[in-house]
Amino acid sequence: FHSLVQSLPAGHLHGRTVLVGADCFPSNHFLLNGMAEAHGFTLKTVAFRQGAAHVEDEDFLNDWTPDVGLALLTWVSSTTSHRINLPQMVAHGRRMGSLIGVDITQAAGLLPFDVSAPEVDFAVSTSLKWMCGTPGAGVLYLSPRLIAHCQPELRGWFSQDNPFNWDITRFAYAPDIRRFDNGTPGVMAALASLPALDWHAAQDQAHILAHNRKLTARLIDAADDLGLPLLTPRPETKRGGSIMVRLPDALPAPQVVATLRA
């Protein structure tokens, strides 16, 4: 994500706004906050409503104005499992003329995701979470329409179409996503995650999701039995694969764990 932001055409974000929600993954916010001054953009964070645990889609849309050069959408929140209405968000972003990116980390490997329906400009993820991989392997998708306009600052011999070009006067970016490669890649994290990817490729993804829905329904029932308020939306269409509850100080954690185990 850092490489992508730095690779955008000079001036694309300067004097404009980058929009994120308060429930985006903190590392993304830390990164953008640190880049704002150097790249001349204003980082705008859509706030929570009073007492809320996730940002409402309506509030995000209201803050998404024509001055937004880039919006980073959190498909599924890491703290509540709230899932945004992605088609509605993307349609609004197109009307605003913004670049639209989506962080799919909290649902990739469980929920179906198609970069073309609706069409987003970029998507980022990791090999962790539902992907069942190891730390260190990331995912970057970039629309072919955008690739040719991006010039990554961090570049090396693998950034070229022919990585064996040693003529220092003839560097040229690869025409595709390989331009975001740089030096000799560290392959161990990717290799360590390969068994998980192979496993996913051999599974019936609809069956996995159906199994998840059965388990999460049991968790919701258990939370209701304990009188624990849900932080996660109840409708399946509005949540990812996790269930989060608010645990009152007066309720002993061991009691909650024992109930869930039962």
Predicted ranges, named:
Residues 1-262:
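Pyridoxal 5′-phosphate
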